[in-house]
Amino acid sequence: MEFLWAPLLGLCCSLAAADRHIVFWNSSNPKFREEDYTVHVQLNDYLDIICPHYEDDSVADAAMERYTLYMVEHQEYVTCEPQSKDQVRWKCNQPSAKHGPEKLSEKFQRFTPFTLGKEFKEGHSYYYISKPIYHQETQCLKLKVTVNGKITHSPHAHANPQEKRLQADDPEVQVLHSIGHSAAPRLFPLVWAVLLLPLLLLQTQ
């Protein structure tokens, strides 16, 4: 039964470690005015796209922002022009939905069991652009997502210089000697005596 807990524990740990990165996809988001709006993620993180939403009637329906989002290659990202309808990723087309703004999510996973799912690799960048539906839009909304590699730190990279001055014979310093020695616990002389006593008694009989 205990073997069943291992995959469940691993799944829980991976879910707990995943981050969610939120992007509000509308023309009023100042981040889209940056030249290279980039979000950095790790594998198994999520990207949440929040679509435009209007809670009152102050904006005419024809003026409400609606977008078709595409996942494209770098050159199409630069020109902000998709090449195929097959590149359509999502549609933000319910700006006045009663349940609130639409949320579209992408999981950056190495493998996916779904036919329409996307697979991502560490060290690669992925590109999203949008084209307006109905309304006129002069600004190109586009996003670059980079999947970072695993962060590794050298054990001595951030060592405290003060720690290097500590001497091994300092009574307040506990030094663990692990290099060149067995990891098995050492047996004290009294323990050896207890273990050898039965052998000594057998020899005397």
Curated annotation (Swiss-Prot):
Keyword Cell inner membrane on entry: no
InterPro entries noted in UniProt: Cupredoxin, Ephrin, Ephrin-A_Ecto, Ephrin_CS, Ephrin_RBD
Glycosylation sites: N26
PTMs per UniProt: Undergoes proteolysis by a metalloprotease to give rise to a soluble monomeric form. N-Glycosylation is required for binding to EPHA2 receptor and inducing its internalization.
Residue numbers covered by the propeptide annotation in the UniProt entry: 183-205
Disulphide bridges: C51-C92, C80-C140
CDD domains, sorted: Ephrin-A_Ectodomain (cd10425)
Domain of life from the UniProt record: Eukaryota
Summary of subunit composition and partner proteins: Monomer. Homodimer. Forms heterodimers with EPHA2. Binds to the receptor tyrosine kinases EPHA2, EPHA3, EPHA4, EPHA5, EPHA6 and EPHA7. Also binds with low affinity to EPHA1.
Protein's UniProt name: Ephrin-A1
